[in-house]
Each structure stands twice: as structure tokens, then as C-alpha cells.
Amino acid sequence: MTDEKIFATPRKVDNVADCYFYHTMELPGHGVIEGRDWDLRGRVDDYLGNVDFAGQRVLEIGPASGFLTFEMEKRGADVVSVEVTAEHGWDFVPYPAAKLEEAIGPRRIVMQQLKNSYWFSHAAHQSKAKVYYGDVYNLPTALGQFDIAVMGSVLLHCRDPLRIIEQCGKMARSLIITDMSHPDLEGAPVCRLAPTPQNFLWHTWWHFSTQFFTQFLAVMGFTTSEILRHQQRHRGRPYTLFTLVGRRE
């Protein structure tokens, strides 16, 4: 049973200058707003595993500016997104405190602007999508049950990605996982630690093989029918991503 009280009240955001757009968006009344990071336009269905969203209740982990939220909604989904609170901010890689402080302050500002971009877009689309601000590692049962859970390029940013998959697997019958492709890891169910002392990759924890996910999904009783590979644009450059869809029998 869903408890509607846990969902955030929509915020009124009037000024696009108060927003950080993670995705390039085409907003009614505003035209194209260039995103700082990803442009997924024209390749959304591949990104989402070519799944039919009509009439489906969807749990989305990490909506950012809401591009996928509203694309799924256009395809007939009822979407609930989970986003971190201001307190959590980000799952920071634990570099020395003095060094990490360089990232924490600016990141808090960006996260607030990112949430603003979601609500700005939400209003422009006259969306009915809902947001829960909380701990992604401990999702409340009050969110209810879902047909599909979507984890789109978020697990690489999380210390404990398997915990998130487990949480989603308890709430949804189908799981969509999209992440960066690393061909050198293929052939074994492995993940590789991404940050080093030199690269200061405070925001990214892991590189994954596809088998890392398919084996864990199988452990949880999910069958993966196929794995799609597709090209998406990040900061003007093409990258290869994979999407897999697991379904519980």
C-alpha cells in the first residue's frame, strides 16, 4: 500500500538560471535547454531496453533533471523517482577530508540546482511524476510495489550497488540496468574500483562487466533475456553503454 504523504511537494522554480541541467531537455514553452552532461535524445528506447512502459508503475533511481522520468511518462508510465536528500548529497569516495572538501561544497550547490532543474522541467511538462527524497539504500515499503525499476547510469556512483539492486528487486518485477560498457572486463562477473589516489574520482566508484549484474540478478531469481549495447553522447563525445533487463519469474 502506497503512502502518498512520503512524496515531495513540487517546488516552484521560475528561473532557469537557478538550474543545473544534467540532460539536454526539450521543454514545452522553453525549447531546447542544453545539458551539461548527457544528451540522450533520439536513443531513449535503447537506453531503456526497448521496454513497453504503457500502464506500468515505475521506480526510478536517481532522476537528475528528469529526462528519463518524463520520457517514460510520455510512454504511459506512472513514475516515482528516488533522489538523495540534502543531508546525503552524494555517495562520496572517501578521499582525505582536506582534499574532499574541494568537491563537497560545490557539489551541494550543484545538487540543489539539479533538483531545481527537475522541478522546472516537471512544471513545463505538467508532469504527474512523484519524487521521494531519502536514503536509496533503505527504501521504505510505503513507496509500494512496482512493475519496473530503472537504474540508469547510477550504480557506478554508489558504494554498494548490489544493495540498491536488492532493494529494487524486492519492489519490482522487472529491473532495467544501464551503465558504461567496459569491454576489457567482459567474460567474468566482476567490478573494478575506479578511483585512484591520482585521478580524484570522488563521484564514481565502479566499472562493471555485464556478467556482474546478470549473475547477481540470477541469484535473486531474475532472468536476463538480452543485453543491448548503444551509443550515447556525454559532453559532446560518443560513449558505448549497455542496458540489460531482468524479469522475475
Feature locations, PLM:
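S-adenosyl-L-methionine-dependent methyltransferase catalytic module, highlighting the catalytic core
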Residues: 137-141, 150-151, 159-249
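N-terminal, positively charged/glycine-rich alpha-helical extensions of SAM-dependent methyltransferases
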Residues: 1-28
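Alpha-helix C-terminal capping/helix-to-coil transition sites in glycosyltransferase folds
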Residues: 54, 145-146, 171
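Conserved alpha-helix/loop element of class I SAM-dependent methyltransferases that forms part
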Residues: 33-56
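Conserved class I S-adenosyl-L-methionine
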Residues: 56-64
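Class I SAM-dependent methyltransferase SAM/SAH-binding core
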Residues: 67-138
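Short amphipathic alpha-helix with an adjacent loop that forms part of the alpha/beta core around
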Residues: 49, 138-145
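Conserved beta-strand positions in the Rossmann-like core of class I SAM-dependent methyltransferases
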Residues: 59, 80, 176
